[in-house]
């Protein structure tokens, strides 16, 4: 998948340039973000796209020494099921 990056957002577009999936993570301090929203277009759900988005974010956060709190229920569950990223999640 060809994810795109913007400040505090990783997303996926369709051929028309429309957002079809995203994870948002506003910065709350210098080295901390809040993963507050995960979205996948209903016609694409069940294909593991949200999992790939949050993993992409976790790798990005680790690489940049940024910690995350999660207020998005999907992200909370994802980090609980991926203890290999405990160093990223607060």
What are these regions (language model features)?
Residues 1-5:
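Conserved N-terminal entry element of GNAT/NAT acetyltransferase domains
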Residues 6-9, 15, 23-32:
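A conserved beta-strand-loop-helix scaffold within acyl/acetyltransferase catalytic domains
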Residues 28, 36-38, 71-74:
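Acidic/polar N-terminal loop/beta-strand segments that form early-domain functional surfaces
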Residues 56, 60-90:
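C-terminal structural segments of small proteins and small subunits
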Residues 38-45:
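A short, internal acetyl-CoA/4′-phosphopantetheine-binding micro-motif in the GNAT/acyltransferase core
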Residues 46-59:
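Conserved acetyl-CoA-binding loop-helix of GNAT-fold acetyltransferases
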């Amino acid at each position: 998948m060809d994810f795109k990056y913007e400040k505090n957002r990783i997303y996926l577009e369709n051929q028309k340039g429309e957002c079809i999936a995203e994870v948002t993570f506003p910065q709350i301090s210098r080295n901390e973000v809040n993963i507050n929203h995960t979205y996948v277009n209903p016609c694409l759900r069940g294909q593991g796209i949200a999992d790939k988005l949050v993993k992409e974010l976790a790798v990005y956060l680790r690489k940049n020494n940024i910690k995350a709190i999660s207020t998005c229920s999907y992200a909370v569950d994802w980090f609980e099921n991926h203890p290999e990223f405990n160093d990223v999640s607060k």
